[in-house]
């Protein structure tokens, strides 16, 4: 076997006591040798197992980049470590190959000379050769020992630097006020977003499973370091319930890593698109108002800061929902401190369908807080219509996107104030907070003056008294006032599952659904509020398959049972789920008695 590539860095080995010898050429290594090499360089067993599972061999190492390492599940720290030790491996490998070739050439030359001498003095030269060989062997042994000692020292130094990486000054930027993130505590799960100069990834806490954070990785070479430091410090200084908070940061040679909470529900844009795909509309006006008011409060907080902070990219994609359905304004990558930059700030910003005219047309370099107000108005429309406010076709000559005629007068007033073409005539955040739309508990329809009640009013009554279902003209009533948990009602399936027509209760459930939906009236009463259930269920035809699959699934869960009222009870439980969804998303469908 060829001479060993490296001495052991420690007594602990991936293979235990039966440690293998690493040849000088790493391309000849099998998977076992690769794992041994990683072990010598203090890789964690869990990460070594990933190389073992993927059967990584020596000739693969040259081609393993970030994409493959991410797919294998290595953390940022381990990815950087791998790149560093592989670079060292290649350098050492080249040195050893060169020195070995020189040694072989020297030996071949000596052998030729010795052979010539042997023709003259066989006995003496044989003795001399033997002595020389012994001396050479001793020298080789000494050289090998010295090489081993040098390699041990190099590896010890390398391993020591790796262990201390999180505590070195390279991981710290004295200009940043935020705490340093212990990056080695997290493992990469998946990529969740990508921008021009940054990537957002989801990470899981290794010590606390199912605890996730988002990490925004910003390319230092592609972005100005000064701007990155400003973004981190700005985020860290902000303290508002509807603005994203920074957990910490980490820095290496190539990237800054900004850690924030992970919101599993995702963005407003994602949610509203999902709703539109099913109902051909966005959020109810009541829901839009509630979200908009909280985001406007966040905008007012930013604009009232000293110096003022302009977000410059407000849109549904940059508004997240937390577990309590509270909106969180995020992605401050385009933000700037207005006072420092208001004289010559000409950097392109904002998505075109949400951008203020003065930004899009580059008619001015004074990008004031009013550009956020325009984008805010576009975001209100986005939530209402379920897509970008221009329908994918913005006419740059138009002053504002079209406003739906069915909106209340109060909502139209806010949109008109936010979407004025000339920024000098746009309302500011404090003026908008005084708008009637953000104060009313009930809304007035613009077409006929009918009162539309907010979802909060109806939901409060629903939680307090439940519902009463009226079936037929003789006022058969089914009172569903038993103590129930709104959370359980809200967790009914939202998508129908497979329906087995051979299920023993299939026909009974189907006939029950058809029986009730064909009655007139088929109404639900929640205190003074009334909903036409027949109209609602006929309008949303998917409710039928959803009801049947959900009820059959719950029957299987509750079996065996002797309760003959189980199926009617489950049906009216489903009706309460329908009421819950209508209250949340379409409160305007209720009327008052």
UniProtKB/Swiss-Prot annotation:
Binding site for ATP: 192-200, 216
Residues covered by region (Disordered): 108-157
Reactions it catalyzes: L-seryl-[protein] + ATP = O-phospho-L-seryl-[protein] + ADP + H(+); L-threonyl-[protein] + ATP = O-phospho-L-threonyl-[protein] + ADP + H(+)
One Pfam family, short name: Pkinase
Active site residues of this protein: 313 (proton acceptor)
Keywords from the named record: ATP-binding, Kinase, Nucleotide-binding, Serine/threonine-protein kinase, Transferase
Any one Gene Ontology molecular-function term assigned to this protein's record: protein serine kinase activity
Annotated EC: 2.7.11.1
Biased composition (Low complexity): 113-153
InterPro entries per UniProt: Kinase-like_dom_sf, MAP_kinase_kinase_kinase, Prot_kinase_dom, SAM, SAM/pointed_sf, Ser/Thr_kinase_AS
Positions of the Protein kinase domain: 186-438
Boundaries of every SAM domain copy: 29-93
Family note: Belongs to the protein kinase superfamily. Ser/Thr protein kinase family.
Name used for this protein in its record: Probable serine/threonine-protein kinase samkB
Species lineage: Eukaryota, Amoebozoa, Evosea, Eumycetozoa, Dictyostelia
Primary gene name: samkB
